[in-house]
Amino acid sequence: MKLILTSLLATIVAAASLAAVAKSASTAQTVRVIESSYSIRLSAKPKPGTVKFLVRNASDDGHDFWLRGGGRTWKTRVMGETGTASLTAVLKRGVKYTYWCAVGSHRSKGMSGSFVAR
């Protein structure tokens, strides 16, 4: 009997964990990122939780997208002219995140920014 109850409890806990993961994935915020000549624009201020960044290169120069904060760093591949990429990050409330393009001297020419997840 004890083995059956333990097995049942383990099944319930596993199902609850899977439901939480599925809910988290379905409620991910989407932020569109437009990279052009020495400029990066975010469509919205990212909030805490799972955020999917959809990045589009709107210029004829190569660009990538880096995001750092909370002890983590995420990056996309370099996109060619009119290329797209995406990355998904889990942002922590109250943490400052910085983002930039690391291609050549793009960051020092203004392709950077920051936000606090609130």
Language-model features, listed with the residues they occupy:
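Short, solvent-exposed loop/turn positions at domain surfaces
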Residues: 39-40, 73, 85
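Bacterial N-terminal signal peptides
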Residues: 6-17
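Extracellular/periplasmic metallocenter environments
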Residues: 23-34, 80-118
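Surface-exposed loop/edge segments in extracytoplasmic proteins
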Residues: 71-78
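N-terminal edge beta-strand
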Residues: 26-50
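Beta-strand cores of secreted/periplasmic/IMS beta-sandwich domains, seen most often
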Residues: 43-61, 85-101
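Short, surface-exposed beta-strand/strand-loop-strand elements in extracellular ectodomains
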Residues: 64-70
